[in-house]
């Protein structure tokens, strides 16, 4: 988890 990786950038809905 960096800054804008799949963890934070991926859509939840």
From Swiss-Prot:
Keywords attached to this entry: Chloroplast, Membrane, Photosynthesis, Photosystem I, Plastid, Thylakoid
Biological process annotations from GO: photosynthesis
Membrane topology recorded in Swiss-Prot or TrEMBL: Peripheral membrane protein
Chief location category: plastid
Compartments (UniProt record): Plastid, Chloroplast thylakoid membrane
GO cellular component terms attached to this protein's record: chloroplast thylakoid membrane; photosystem I
Family of the protein in this entry: Belongs to the PsaE family.
Function: Stabilizes the interaction between PsaC and the PSI core, assists the docking of the ferredoxin to PSI and interacts with ferredoxin-NADP oxidoreductase.
The name this protein goes by in its record: Photosystem I reaction center subunit IV
Organism: Pisum sativum
């Amino acid at each position: 988890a960096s800054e804008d990786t799949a963890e934070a950038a991926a859509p939840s809905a």
